[in-house]
Amino acid sequence: MVSVGTQSHSGRDQAEQNPSVENVRYDWQLDEALAIYNLPLLELIGRANSVHRRYHDAGHLQKSSLLSIKTGGCPEDCGYCSQSAHHDVELTREKLMNPTAVIGLAAKAKKAGAERFCMGAAWRKVRDGKEFDAVLEMIRGVRALDMEACVTLGMVNEDQARRLAEAGLTAYNHNLDTGPAYYPQIVSTHSYQDRLETLAKIRDAGIALCTGGIIGLGESPRDRVEMLVVLAGMNPHPESVPVNMLVPIEGTPLADADPVDPLEIVRMIATARLMMPQSMVRLSAGRSTLSRETQILCLVAGANSIFYGNVLLTTPNADMAADDALLEALGVTAE
């Protein structure tokens, strides 16, 4: 099969004449993916935009809302995370929220224009009992609002994945963060294989996967692309691929990480779009640090979802009024 990044002129002509030409692949190699990532930026964005328009409505953007339903005290030692109990961070720990309160906030998010409601709990893994039952109630309540429901709860077993599916869960977020070679530099309390096994259990239960990563962790471009190769090797591809920029937080090991050129997130989004053309590519954490122009480049390169709201778990997000003005200026519909 001819790849998006290396197809011949005849292959490109055929694709342009026939929008239904299949370009979805699961056999990406690291070297060819790196070659795509390192294309001249304008060529990379142009190719990604062409694929984006072939598979998606370029005039539509999904708004998602994200809520921390249980904050702080996580036993994992992820180097970027303010919620880890291993780090000396000024953060107020909060117990699991009441389902009624969560569903009420979901209703407000829907009224503000959000289509998907995401809920995050700072757990290593799900434990059966009252708290998990409460999360299932939250999911059912969000779905009753005719919203998509996504949760991130840590590791799950097969039975828990089944119960999440029965509650109507739309998607489960479990990020790979970076490539497998660099992953041990970020966290030591679980392995890359642990992440992949949880994703497999979620997929086996029939729940859509939301899994992506973070740039700015001290990784190399090769590490970033290595993660994309892992994701693009999943058949089918993840339904959602969030792309985050590190938000340095005082007290975490990565508080003083060197900043990344914002155009690197544009490259990441464009490469993800080319490698996983049918997936939702979500411009996620760190967006508040990007200029208006860089955000527009991300959308042109293939991002078709943003988080809408002033806070993402424990980090700031882009201003809602500024988002409204940006979307109006672009002339895109968002929900």
From Swiss-Prot:
Binding-site residues, [4Fe-4S] cluster: C74, C78, C81
Describe how the cofactor binds: Binds 1 [4Fe-4S] cluster. The cluster is coordinated with 3 cysteines and an exchangeable S-adenosyl-L-methionine.
Any coiled-coil regions, as ranges? none
GO biological processes: biotin biosynthetic process
Q: Which residues bind [2Fe-2S] cluster?
A: C118, C150, C210, R282
* Domain of life per record: Bacteria
Q: Which InterPro entries match?
A: Aldolase_TIM (IPR013785), BATS_dom (IPR010722), Biotin_synth/BioAB (IPR002684), Biotin_synthase (IPR024177), Elp3/MiaA/NifB-like_rSAM (IPR006638), rSAM (IPR007197)
Q: Which PROSITE patterns match?
A: RADICAL_SAM
What are the required cofactors?
[4Fe-4S] cluster; [2Fe-2S] cluster
Instruction: Return the annotated region ranges for Disordered.
Output: 1-20
Could you say which EC number(s) this protein's record lists?
A: 2.8.1.6
Pathway(s) annotated for this protein in UniProt: Cofactor biosynthesis; biotin biosynthesis; biotin from 7,8-diaminononanoate: step 2/2
UniProt KW keywords: 2Fe-2S, 4Fe-4S, Biotin biosynthesis, Iron, Iron-sulfur, Metal-binding, S-adenosyl-L-methionine, Transferase
**GO MF term set:** 2 iron, 2 sulfur cluster binding; 4 iron, 4 sulfur cluster binding; biotin synthase activity; iron ion binding
Residue ranges spanning the membrane: these are none
Has UniProt tagged this entry with the keyword Lyase?
no
Q: What sequence ranges are listed for the domain Radical SAM core?
A: 59-284
What sort of enzyme, by top EC class, is this?
Answer: transferase
Reaction catalysed by this enzyme: (4R,5S)-dethiobiotin + (sulfur carrier)-SH + 2 reduced [2Fe-2S]-[ferredoxin] + 2 S-adenosyl-L-methionine = (sulfur carrier)-H + biotin + 2 5'-deoxyadenosine + 2 L-methionine + 2 oxidized [2Fe-2S]-[ferredoxin]
Q: Per the record, a Pfam family?
A: Radical_SAM
Family named by the database record = Belongs to the radical SAM superfamily. Biotin synthase family.
Assembly and binders: Homodimer.
Functionally, this protein is described as follows: Catalyzes the conversion of dethiobiotin (DTB) to biotin by the insertion of a sulfur atom into dethiobiotin via a radical-based mechanism.
What is the name of this protein?
Biotin synthase
Q: Which gene encodes it?
A: bioB
